[in-house]
């Protein structure tokens, strides 16, 4: 599968009009979103775009009522005051304002890791074995789910990102602590089979899968610290070779489209170290745009710098 990005369609920054960079918010990913938004804002302004920051959904609603903006670049991460659960997409559609990223359905579905898995499985796409745990699940239910899936497992909130509230569990004694951590966040919990092997991610831009990235953290796994703070995490791009790289790119596109996503995003995948089997984990519909973020790294592999990447994403609103 060739990875070719068409040339930019727009050359005049005035074509975008007044652009709101939606950032911050009140989700658990606020700090990451502020960082992403600041980078996007700087890149747009460097290209001559009339861009202004807007912190959170209430501020955006006020701006839309006042007709202050012509379009929105959404880097509001997460849910519950974030911009990846379909709520802010519905707001922007109600005002008829174009925005970056997936629509209401794609955003809402992808924010719910459990429902996304159900869609993938219905289409024959591989994802780790899992169980849904309701908030307040009993110890008996928790341990029964782990026994059914088979240890080791990962326990996480079903609707959070950035590895917030995530634990790896290798024995029954660790389960209660993992569930307690994940239960600090709203909604159901997801317990899923832990796939031992390579952690990979594939960015999607338009209808093209960018080169995959294989993530090699210094520690045992790619947690919040490895994602946003540590300087010793290795990123290998492309992450795979030959047919395997083509396979993961096509899988990412299939998974992205199956979830109703469009515009741009990122699909996270595990590759079993013993069998080479690929397993879909989740879709991110407003990926990070920090100095550690993965979409910019993949774009650079194709000669697309950060400013050009931000421009390409915004182009999709025209």
Curated annotation (Swiss-Prot):
Task: Determine the domain of life of the protein's source.
Answer: Bacteria
What Gene Ontology cellular component terms go with this record?
cytosol
Query: Which reactions appear under catalytic activity for this entry?
Result: 2 D-alanine + ATP = D-alanyl-D-alanine + ADP + phosphate + H(+)
Q: Which InterPro entries match?
A: ATP-grasp, ATP_grasp_subdomain_1, D-Ala_lig_Van_CS, D_ala_D_ala, Dala_Dala_lig_C, Dala_Dala_lig_N, PreATP-grasp_dom_sf
Q: Where does Mg(2+) 1 bind?
A: 268, 282
Q: Which UniProt keywords apply?
A: ATP-binding, Cell shape, Cell wall biogenesis/degradation, Cytoplasm, Ligase, Magnesium, Manganese, Metal-binding, Nucleotide-binding, Peptidoglycan synthesis
Q: Which residues form the ATP-grasp domain?
A: 117-315
Question: According to its UniProt record, in which pathway does this protein act?
Answer: Cell wall biogenesis; peptidoglycan biosynthesis
Name its cellular compartments: Cytoplasm
Residues engaged in binding Mg(2+) 2: 282, 284
Q: Which cofactor does it need?
A: Mg(2+); Mn(2+)
Offer an example of a GO molecular function term for this protein.
ATP binding
EC number in record: 6.3.2.4
The GO annotation for biological process reads:
cell wall organization; peptidoglycan biosynthetic process; regulation of cell shape
Q: Which enzyme class, named as a word?
A: ligase
Q: Name one Pfam family in it.
A: Dala_Dala_lig_N
Query: Where ATP is bound, by residue?
Result: 146-201
Could you tell me what the cofactor note in this record states?
A: Binds 2 magnesium or manganese ions per subunit.
State which residue ranges cross the membrane.
none
Report the family membership.
Answer: Belongs to the D-alanine--D-alanine ligase family.
What's the stated role of this polypeptide?
Answer: Cell wall formation.
Output this protein's name: D-alanine--D-alanine ligase B
Species name: Xanthomonas campestris pv. campestris (strain ATCC 33913 / DSM 3586 / NCPPB 528 / LMG 568 / P 25)
């Amino acid at each position: 599968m060739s990875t070719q990005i068409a040339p930019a369609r727009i050359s005049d920054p005035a074509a975008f009009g007044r652009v709101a960079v939606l950032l911050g918010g009140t989700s658990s990913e606020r700090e990451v979103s502020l960082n992403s938004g600041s980078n996007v804002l700087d890149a747009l302004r460097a290209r001559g775009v009339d861009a202004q920051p807007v912190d959170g959904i209430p501020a955006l609603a006020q701006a839309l009522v006042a007709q202050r903006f012509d379009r929105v670049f959404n880097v509001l991460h997460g849910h519950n005051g974030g911009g990846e659960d379909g709520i802010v997409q519905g707001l922007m559609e109600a005002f008829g304002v174009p925005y970056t990223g997936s629509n209401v359905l794609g955003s809402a579905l992808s924010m719910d890791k459990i429902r996304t898995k159900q869609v993938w499985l219905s289409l024959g796409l591989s994802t780790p074995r899992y169980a849904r745990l309701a908030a307040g699940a009993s110890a008996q239910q928790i341990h029964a789910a782990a026994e059914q899936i088979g240890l080791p497992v990962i326990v996480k909130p079903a609707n959070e990102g950035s590895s917030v509230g995530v634990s790896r569990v290798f024995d029954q004694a660790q389960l209660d602590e993992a569930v307690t951590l994940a239960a600090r966040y709203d909604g159901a919990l997801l317990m899923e089979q832990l796939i031992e092997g390579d952690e990979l991610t594939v960015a999607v831009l338009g209808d093209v899968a960018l080169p995959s990235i294989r993530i090699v953290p210094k520690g045992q796994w790619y947690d919040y610290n490895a994602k946003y703070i540590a300087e010793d995490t290795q990123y290998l791009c492309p992450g795979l070779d030959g047919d395997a790289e083509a396979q993961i790119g096509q899988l990412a596109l299939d998974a992205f489209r199956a979830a109703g996503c469009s515009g741009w995003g990122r699909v996270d995948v595990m590759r079993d170290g013993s069998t080479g089997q690929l397993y879909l984990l989740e879709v991110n519909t407003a990926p990070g745009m920090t100095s550690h973020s993965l979409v910019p790294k993949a774009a650079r592999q194709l000669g697309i710098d950060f400013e050009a990447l931000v421009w390409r994403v915004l182009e999709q609103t025209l």
